[in-house]
Amino acid sequence: LENKVMISQLPLSDKNFSHLTMNEPEFIEGWSMNSYGKATDYEGKKFNAVQKYKILGTSIDSLTKNNILKSPNYIKIDVDGIEDKILIGGKKTLKNKKVKSISIEVNENYKSQYKSIIKILKELRFVFKHKKHAEIYNKNKKFNKVFNYVFYKK
């Protein structure tokens, strides 16, 4: 698998090699729901960060342009609220024919981001295939509109 899968340990955004603020709403080891570049949660609501620090991040396009990353075939994005920024920072890479499919977490309650994600992917000639989430989310009002959407390239 190590020759087929590459995990980016740099936070991704729409900015090229920038130090942006990582905002943590609470400090729990291994916790998600942090936000990079802005203090908003997975629904776009502002929160007061209990911990903040600058961290170097970049865009997908910077990684491919500088040959740090080869153009991927499949992409998975799950970042709790800045998915659209990552897509914006990867537009050139996502136009590449090598990219076949994207799985992206979408919160349908975060309407502006939901619309932005769909618009960007449509512009890049991606077609919606399906959306899924764990059955347990159906009973959880907080996450019942959060899905992993899968798109494929036309």
Where are these regions (language model features)?
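Phosphate/nucleotide-binding beta-alpha loop and adjacent structural elements of enzyme active sites
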Residues: 1-154
